[in-house]
Structures are given as structure tokens and as C-alpha cells.
Amino acid sequence: RAVLVDMEPKAVRDVTAAAGATGRWSYAAGRTHCEQGGSGNNWAHGYYEHGPRCAQAVTELIRAELEAAERAGGVLIYQALAGGTGSGVGAHIAATVRDEWPELAVVSGAIWPSERGDVAVQPYN
């Protein structure tokens, strides 16, 4: 079970296409949330702007996955530490999940930035 979230549709489109091309894995249709503007590689922009704006839609996607499960013990959130969507929006969604489902374990897996990042502010997020 998965919900994919990004503020730029290209990343989600690429991931779902790559998974589908393998023939071994695919993501459920309708379990993605994308917007048209990125977070500008800025944690605060992701957390304070995009996070509150997309929290309800993402929460409903997560709720649908939890309700479809026979039993749910927790939510695993993978988020990139570089940039504004993974770090900022991811942190906001993690807090929202914790508030919405206090009985579930919430585990966050960090995806560390590359040593050769192409964005100057990457280490500061």
C-alpha cells in the first residue's frame, strides 16, 4: 500500500511509470497527490505553505489505504531531506498523521541527499 505525494507531478509520474514498466510492481491508481508548483527547495515553504494546503487531500488518501487494510499497525513515511517537498511537506504530513491516528505507529525514513546535489541550499534543509 502506498500514497505518493509530490508538489511537482513529474516525479510521481516517473516513479509510477518506472514501477509499471517492471511488470512486478505498480502503484494503485488514484493514490497520488501532485500540485503544479514545487516547494522551491525550501523546507519552510513546504511545511508552512504546501503542507497545510495539501494535508486534507493526503490524509484522505491515507485514510482510504488504512480502511482497505485488514489491519493497520502504523504508517511508514519516506521523505527526502533535501528540498522542500520531502522535508517540509513530509514533516507536516507526518505531524498530521500523528494527530489523526494517535493509535498508529508513525515511522519516518529519511532519504539522505546526494553528495553532489545540484541545488545550493540542499544541505540547509
Language model features: what each stretch is:
Residues 1-125:
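Segments that form or flank anion-binding pockets
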